[in-house]
């Protein structure tokens, strides 16, 4: 059974004062089952982030409908968790309090302090539980944003270029932590990324977009076992295939 469906979805942004229209997405049709890890790749301006915001319910389509378990998505809900390109932390709360507050919105029971400590330790922030956002680097703050959403275990985890601000080693570590969470709670992950290798490493399916207006150019299923070897011949073949479709 499909977990998420986009049926003939288009999105047009209008600038009323300038009488101008921007066609961000046009005629998007997509069906995704639960427990898939889907990455969306494509050039800038092809509507990748717009698609995530439509799925989250933050904005509504100009045409078509988006269904979660056969129910129309028309607003945000705790069933969907989203991590944006830039950290979105409450500056008046400590790192631990930020994580606890977000988790408590999803769960009626208070989040276990030990679980918070474990998650922070996994991403190298165990010593920063009592620090405030202004005391963190951009990459550290983004790791907190990821943990804050992860700990609530949403049915759909939406990631908008979440690892772009991290250094290479931290980025690879976070890729594995996100994969571990996905395999543990068996939810649906949808991630926007500009990194083709990252998409092949993490995904069961890759959606390749083309711009102006944003359309789906091709969908590629990645049939590789986890954990994946970035140096294997099959991995390299998938990476090269995606790059070729993107005209690189």
Question: Which ranges hold each PLM region?
Answer:
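The feature captures the beta-strand-to-loop junction immediately N-terminal to the Walker
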Residues: 41-43
């Amino acid at each position: 059974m499909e977990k998420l469906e986009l049926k003939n979805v288009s999105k047009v942004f209008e600038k009323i004062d300038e009488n101008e229209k921007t066609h961000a997405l046009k005629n998007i049709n997509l069906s995704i089952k639960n427990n898939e890890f889907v990455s969306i790749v494509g050039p800038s301006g092809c509507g990748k982030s717009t698609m995530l915001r439509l799925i989250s319910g933050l904005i509504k389509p100009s045409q078509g409908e988006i269904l979660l378990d056969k129910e129309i998505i028309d607003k945000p809900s705790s069933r969907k968790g989203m991590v944006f390109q830039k950290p979105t932390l409450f500056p008046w709360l400590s790192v631990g309090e930020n994580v606890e507050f977000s988790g408590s919105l999803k769960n009626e029971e208070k989040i276990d302090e030990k679980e918070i400590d474990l998650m922070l330790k996994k991403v190298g922030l165990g010593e920063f539980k009592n620090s405030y956002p202004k005391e963190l680097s951009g990459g550290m703050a983004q790791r907190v944003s990821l943990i804050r959403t992860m700990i609530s275990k949403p049915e759909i985890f939406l990631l908008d270029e979440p690892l772009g601000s991290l250094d290479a080693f931290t980025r690879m570590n976070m890729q594995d932590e996100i994969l571990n969470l996905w395999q543990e709670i068996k939810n649906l992950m949808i991630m926007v990324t500009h990194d083709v290798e990252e998409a092949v490493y993490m995904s069961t399916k890759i959606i390749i977009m083309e711009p102006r207006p944003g359309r789906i150019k091709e969908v590629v299923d990645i049939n590789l076992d986890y954990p994946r070897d970035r140096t294997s011949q099959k991995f390299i073949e998938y990476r090269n295939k995606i790059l070729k479709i993107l005209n690189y």
